[in-house]
Amino acid sequence: SPEDIVGMQVSQGILTVRGGMTSHAAVVARGMGTCCVSGCGNDNDVKIDEEAKTFELNGHKFVEGDWISIDGSTGNIYGEQVATVAATGNKNFNRFMGWADAARQLLVMTNADNPRDAQQAVDLGAEGIGLCRTEHMFFAEDRIKAVREMICARTVEEREAALAKVEPFQQGDFEAMYRIMGERPMTIRYLDPPLHEFLPSKDEDIKELAADMGMTFDDLKNVVASLHEFNPMMGHRGCRLAVTYPEIAAMQTRAVIKAALNVSAETGYIITPHIMIPLVGEVKELKFVKDVVVKVADELIKASGVDMKYLVGTMIEIPRAALTAGEIAKEAEFFSFGTNDLTQMTFGFSRDDAAKF
């Protein structure tokens, strides 16, 4: 949820009861560079009292202000402040990787969702960004309200007005990232998670948001309820959102193309935006969203008078997409593999629960 992301961003470490090494919390924390131990027990082992701000673990009670130390490599938890040593470079490792660099032919890229991540990626030698998850940009405090207005919109006009508030933020982030990446490739994935993830679930949080947005509690509660899904991972998300609300894809395309044009004019970099449409299951879905992207992008590029190239591809993360990849390839200009969802849907495992058995 948005509250989880904001909390994770300001945390020095993350400890969760549920999940495992491959759960969403662990993956996001790893991307943030934040120490995380995910899945430290079950509800019987760990008792959390949010109101009192305490938790019990293996018979030990911790209150707000107490120190604990966690080791993200081993999963160990220490009930005290443990002295730490800053990580240092390994000469033997660096030497070995130098040999690998001399022999390899593949580019080694990274995930980065904001300018800070992009700068760190370049500093550590990344040759591009293989995945920029645009929804993480939506969670920032200065733009989440506009995103929520878009979700609660009742008409296309209301939705477009809210998206117009989000667009400058997205464009600004993309411009900053393009300046950092230079001519290195950057693949930008369009909005992927279901919309309910941007709204609160607790009544007290819904009341607070309703007052902030000028809505009644009941109206906002109904919006939240209407977005509820029994299995959101397989629900209204990814390209399905763009099919239902093409104005979202249009806004994101404007932000990407304008950012690339501006930075290219400013720096002289030859930038080729890579636009990724997520969760495609068959070629008709990709073509529908691609047509929206191409129309908006071509109009902006023509108006600029610059001959800028761009690519539109997709992520293969549904078994049906893998089976019909030959058809999808007729429309896609590149593929990326989303191994998290593809593995879960192929084997019927949940990455949040598989570690238990």
Across the structure, where does each feature detected by a protein language model lie?
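Conserved alpha/beta-domain cores
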Residues: G89-F357
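Acidic, glycine-rich flexible loop/linker segments
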Residues: S1-C132, H136-M150
